[in-house]
Amino acid sequence: MYASSARDGIPGKWCNARRKQLPLLISKDFPAELYHSLPCKSLENGHIKKVKGVKATLAEAPATPTEKSNSEVPQKKLKVLVAGGGIGGLVFALAGKKRGFDVLVFERDISAIRGEGQYRGPIQIQSNALAALEAIDMDVAEEIMNAGCITGQRINGLVDGISGNWYCKFDTFTPAVERGLPVTRVISRMTLQQILARLQGEDVIMNESHVVNFADDGETVTVNPELCQQYTGDLLVGADGIRSKVRTNLFGPSELTYSGYTCYTGIADFVPADIDTAGYRVFLGHKQYFVSSDVGGGKMQWYAFHNEPAGGVDAPNGKKERLLKIFGGWCDNVIDLSVATDEDAILRRDIYDRPPTFSWGKGRVTLLGDSVHAMQPNLGQGGCMAIEDSYQLALELEKAWSRSAESGSPMDVISSLRSYESARKLRVGVIHGLARMAAIMASAYKAYLGVGLGPLSFITKFRIPHPGRVGGRFFIDLGMPLMLSWVLGGNGEKLEGRIQHCRLSEKANDQLRNWFEDDDALERATDAEWLLLPAGNSNAALETLVLSRDENMPCTIGSVSHANIPGKSVVIPLSQVSDMHARISYNGGAFLGTAFRSDHGTWFIDNEGRRYRVSPNFPMRFHSSDVIVFGSDKAAFRIKAMKFAPKTAAKEDRQAVGAA
């Protein structure tokens, strides 16, 4: 039970908790203005013992109802067989066990759960799925959320891939807070599966048991796993993924639908400069896009999508090289993250989905997750839909059992499965369509006139905004809040028994609303080191300059030292650089460059490739990724904001090109 002092101090409904150390939960009516940012938390991955296959037995119902703890849920006379030990199968197994059913999961290979084999990277669990996990088991939901990294209380959204400028920001925080839902997190897929598998118990998951066939005689279902004996249960749940054997046996073989995109994915030890303010971004380009997300622990996960025929193969150790070729010329956020990723950490796969279907099952067999509604990853809702499926299926089985117990008649398993399917089809179908639509939008995105016009592509160099980009933003700004509100909160009313609440540990920075509306305020909030990095092949003699964020320490740049001027003096001994050429100062969270009168001038190249001369004695704001040129192209520097300055640049004796 929560402490009475905390409970009495905050209005709203409260629910009991089974662990005293759980984060404080507060009512959804608590003022949203009081949510402020906290750093992401993560837990060490645990270990799981190898699961041995055992024969399941039909549990007997208790003779008399007794009060039991959560670990002693009275079992019911219902044996549920589950094909597939992925996230959907394991979440459903947990939900079924919590409701007292005898569940047995057949999994072909649990090496991923044990942390072996290729690392598949993190998974985003959004507010709707986290709420479903809470409705299944609050303790389990807390453990999963504590192991994840919160991204929903930061800025997320669409970005132009070339310039890095924000195109549309997504507010996933407000829909969650207004509905009393957990805030979106990213968690290691392996960690999530380990938590779910550990809580099942060793007698629940059958390893090396791939379900390839089954028989439904109307009263029971018998499965025939490879290399295993037959098992019989009251129903079968196919949670065996996009290439589901259960689905094939139900409805016959069917072709997957290729999305038109191949996907490179990787994870890197990399911390962006704006890690405290930005969670995930989708960088848009014509027929290609790049997704990056903070996953906690100083790591970033990314996905790079490129429109091309299926079945492509890279040369040995050639994935990174091709990735940089495809996205060459894109903004620093994309290039830096790609460069920071090791070759052996990059995977490639073609993206497929399945068209929506009205047939989810037959008789005593039903499907769940990717086996019936595999969708493209553009909304991050594939795993979330499987979690929602799991909750709904367990709920419908529980209702059918209760009706059976009250009436004294046999449980109507078949009707309960059809009820589950009916409850899920519309919502899943809409989200499936939205995921496809997101891919179409990415394919059609054109930042400038001339993009994709072949012989007329030279028009691109004039950087004229494409009309579709302007019009598209209007419709996205109008429709995105409504879409996010429904996707994240549209299933909340079906979560029976879950009390709406929010956590103080999920509070956002009090400037979050301002950041959504003001790109400049968002950039000024970046807590990072600012550097001038030599740009171009002719700058081998130049060294990195570290700029000071002390407003009383401006940086004076010239061909000779100016030790008598307050601040730092940087010497660039080139003939095109005047004695006192320019000054860089810091004011109000922004860097300003002031050019003095000189024969060769000072030039800026902004993040969209536009080059212009800086007017003398007129301070000009510059941004990360801009290029500043002192006198000529031989003294060009790229401006870069970094969370941590390079060690070589941090040394004081290397902060200037010449003696100061």
Curated annotation (Swiss-Prot):
EC number: 1.14.15.21
The FHA domain, residue ranges: 545-609
Superkingdom of origin organism: Eukaryota
Record: transit peptide: 1-49
Needed cofactors: FAD
Cellular component GO terms, alphabetical: chloroplast membrane; chloroplast thylakoid membrane
Keyword Oxidoreductase appears in the UniProt entry: yes
Gene3D superfamilies registered for this protein in UniProt: 2.60.200.20, FAD/NAD(P)-binding domain (3.50.50.60)
GO molecular function, one term: FAD binding
Subcellular location: Plastid, Chloroplast membrane; Plastid, Chloroplast thylakoid membrane
InterPro entries in the cross-refs: FAD-bd, FAD/NAD-bd_sf, FHA_dom, SMAD_FHA_dom_sf, Zeaxanthin_epoxidase
Ranges in coiled-coil conformation: none
Biological pathway: Plant hormone biosynthesis; abscisate biosynthesis
Induction: Up-regulated by oxidative stress and when chloroplasts undergo differentiation into chromoplasts.
Keyword annotations of the record: Abscisic acid biosynthesis, Chloroplast, FAD, Flavoprotein, Membrane, Oxidoreductase, Plastid, Thylakoid, Transit peptide
Reactions performed catalytically: all-trans-zeaxanthin + 4 reduced [2Fe-2S]-[ferredoxin] + 2 O2 + 4 H(+) = all-trans-violaxanthin + 4 oxidized [2Fe-2S]-[ferredoxin] + 2 H2O; all-trans-zeaxanthin + 2 reduced [2Fe-2S]-[ferredoxin] + O2 + 2 H(+) = all-trans-antheraxanthin + 2 oxidized [2Fe-2S]-[ferredoxin] + H2O; all-trans-antheraxanthin + 2 reduced [2Fe-2S]-[ferredoxin] + O2 + 2 H(+) = all-trans-violaxanthin + 2 oxidized [2Fe-2S]-[ferredoxin] + H2O; beta-cryptoxanthin + 2 reduced [2Fe-2S]-[ferredoxin] + O2 + 2 H(+) = (5R,6S)-5,6-epoxi-beta-cryptoxanthin + 2 oxidized [2Fe-2S]-[ferredoxin] + H2O
Keyword Plastid: yes
CDD domains xref list: FHA_ZEP-like
Membrane topology term: Peripheral membrane protein
Free-text function comment from the UniProt entry: Converts zeaxanthin into antheraxanthin and subsequently violaxanthin. Also acts on beta-cryptoxanthin. Involved in the epoxidation of zeaxanthin.
Protein name: Zeaxanthin epoxidase, chloroplastic
Top-level taxonomy: Eukaryota, Viridiplantae, Streptophyta, Embryophyta, Tracheophyta
